[in-house]
Amino acid sequence: MDRIAIVDLGIGNLANVKKALKGYITSDPYEIEKADKIVLPGVGNFGAVVDKLAPIKDIIIEGINEGKPFLGICLGMQLLFEESEESPGKEGLGIFKGKVVKLKNVRTPHIGWNQVWIKKECKLFEGLKNGSYFYFVHSYHAVPQDPDIIATTTDYENAEFVSSVCFENIFGVQFHPEKSSKNGLILLRNFRRL
């Protein structure tokens, strides 16, 4: 069975992610390095999480570059990008070119159930219907430079944003699969089976 490291940055409830993925929660660089797959859940402020991530940032990037499946959840997806309007001057992981911007002309935070619309084939969404509902809690969203990494989009109050990205071994979801009932469990199971 694959060893799935769920990165603990001291924020958020990781128990549901751990249960669904049958992984282990850790902030130990050695344990992350040994993992077959890496999951980075995150809530909170981009800059604060970048600071907490500093001691293990290079290990995570190295794992991604080695081809280990990686899943970023919510802020964990945003951290795949270079920067965020939320914390000017703070650098994300920089795996994807692009930035994170505040949702504009809508009520924030965006909290609740919303549909995701599939834009390209992605292993995470196998067995899920186009327009499946997932649970969101966020005020910022990623704007990738490369449209080819966009796996799904979501419409919120007539504004469309990228709700997931997918490229080779790298996956990011803006929503919370661990709070998304059956659909979320299917998505996490798909990641576990990669």
Curated annotation (Swiss-Prot):
Active site: C74, H176, E178
A GO-annotated cellular component: cytoplasm
Catalytic activity, reaction form: 5-[(5-phospho-1-deoxy-D-ribulos-1-ylimino)methylamino]-1-(5-phospho-beta-D-ribosyl)imidazole-4-carboxamide + L-glutamine = D-erythro-1-(imidazol-4-yl)glycerol 3-phosphate + 5-amino-1-(5-phospho-beta-D-ribosyl)imidazole-4-carboxamide + L-glutamate + H(+); L-glutamine + H2O = L-glutamate + NH4(+)
Stretches assigned to the Glutamine amidotransferase type-1 domain: 3-194
Enzyme Commission no: 4.3.2.10, 3.5.1.2
Keyword Transport: no
CDD domains: GATase1_IGP_Synthase
GO molecular function: glutaminase activity; imidazoleglycerol-phosphate synthase activity; lyase activity
Keyword vocabulary terms for this entry: Amino-acid biosynthesis, Cytoplasm, Glutamine amidotransferase, Histidine biosynthesis, Hydrolase, Lyase
PROSITE patterns: GATASE_TYPE_1
Pathway membership: Amino-acid biosynthesis; L-histidine biosynthesis; L-histidine from 5-phospho-alpha-D-ribose 1-diphosphate: step 5/9
One Pfam family per UniProt: GATase
One GO term of the biological process aspect: L-histidine biosynthetic process
Protein purpose: IGPS catalyzes the conversion of PRFAR and glutamine to IGP, AICAR and glutamate. The HisH subunit catalyzes the hydrolysis of glutamine to glutamate and ammonia as part of the synthesis of IGP and AICAR. The resulting ammonia molecule is channeled to the active site of HisF.
Stored HAMAP family: HisH (MF_00278)
Protein name per its UniProtKB record: Imidazole glycerol phosphate synthase subunit HisH
